[in-house]
């Protein structure tokens, strides 16, 4: 591992096969945690390449638990996180809106690493526990058209890496790899990164992984979500073609707003924000969710344009369908918890 650390520290990019070897060493319990941390920090300082990201994703997926589900049009809207904007959990809220609009959502997520509340933290604050077995995870997907995969449960080899990431306390290559390692076979994906210079490379990684259609966003102000604060950079992956474009909130009929208007807090505070949105409280939080969910519906082929997607997302909330999805998942979680106690 030290030889890879030294090479990356002097700015050397690793070839795909070399990164395969380095990735396997990271997951090897015999490798010193300090060496893994040094490698992750060196990669971050150098700047990760598409080959390095794709290689680590391949190794992680090979170690993940196998999930048997029918090959339907499953979608994930998990972002990379780690943008430092301290906003509420936009993609988690958007997942319920997407499901309310008819998308089949298999959302990958984790606890907080470099934010105040990760996806799993806010789900628990909403009343949804994240310790479902794999069978329960699939049952929820089949029953409600939405499920949440807590990364450590489906990537058991990530336990030690997770502890190292917590110690580092800032984004690493694992943030980039997270959205790429959902064990459920995906047809479409909407994901965000906070590196506008890397959107095209990230889209090429998704193409290598076999996505038929996907949208990658690098949001205004350095967000890993579509932002109301200005121009957002996108790449659309459609049947092998990579198409860059840009968009503002004004372009789809939404009001612009600074990032400070959508600041979040801890898990409990973010859960309250999400419930307020689903109860139809309009404002920047609401607009941010329908903006992102609308893009997701366009990515999933349910809307012909992003503006049409925003209208569908708005209807998902105002009709009560998004809240119904949330309540249904909470009820499922409560039922599973009661069974566990009874045992």
Task: Please provide the spans of the model-predicted regions.
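N-terminal basic/disordered segments at the start of proteins
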Residues: 1-13, 77-83
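A general structural signal for well-ordered alpha-helical segments in protein cores
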Residues: 1-2, 19, 36, 53, ...
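Glycine-rich anion-binding loops and their surrounding alpha/beta cores
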Residues: 7, 62-65, 87, 102, ...
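N-terminal glycine-rich anion-binding loops that anchor highly charged ligand groups
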Residues: 8-54, 62-70, 288-289
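Helix N-cap / loop-to-helix initiation motif
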Residues: 15, 32-33, 49, 104, ...
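A glycine-rich phosphate/pyrophosphate-binding beta-strand-loop-alpha-helix module
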Residues: 40, 88-144
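Active-site cofactor/substrate anionic-group-binding motifs, chiefly glycine-
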Residues: 47-113
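Beta-strand segments within the central parallel beta-sheet cores of soluble alpha/beta enzyme folds
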Residues: 54-57, 72, 136-140, 217, ...
